[in-house]
Amino acid sequence: FNPILQYGVEDFCKKCNEIGIDGLIIPDLPIDYYEENYKSIFKKYEIYNMFLIAPQTSDERIKKIDSISDGFIYMVSSSSITGSKDSFSSEQLKYFERIEKMNLKTPRIIGFGVGNKETFEAAVKFSKGAIIGSAFIRNLHLNGIDSISKFIYSIKD
């Protein structure tokens, strides 16, 4: 969050709006600090701030995040590094089920560990979508830009 503070939060949000950015993930922006000091600025410039939750996040904190969110909630699938597995563990699936049962108002999107058809299908079973980061970059690096459509369809279809 420090680079945004140095730039100026309002100037940053204004610039984001001008160039077509409508959502941000700022992992080190504390939720209470955001709510008290910056939510109105983000709203003024129509910028969504996406908060992250993880398996260790308490139900109380998740409910707080849900109450102030207006974009989506980024469900981090595990505490491990991103792009590290080919399937979700039973513990991860229990976490997804726990969050689903909370009936949150804010859509959830699952990321970290989504990179093939199996993990994509599991993610969208419990959320509104999936974020495919590391696997996408790895495919791009190994197979080039012409492989992107094939990669996406191998997951989606």
Spell out what each predicted region is.
Residues 20-22, 45-49, 70-71, 104-108, ...:
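Short, well-ordered coil/turn segments that N-cap beta-strands
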Residues 20-34, 48-57, 76:
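Catalytic beta/alpha-barrel core
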Residues 57-68, 102-103, 110, 114-130:
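Catalytic cores of alpha/beta
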Residues 1, 42-52, 100-113:
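Short beta-strand/loop segments at the ligand-binding rim of alpha/beta enzyme cores
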Residues 77, 101-103, 115-121, 141-143, ...:
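Expand to "…catalyze enediolate/carbanion chemistry for C-C bond making/breaking, isomerization
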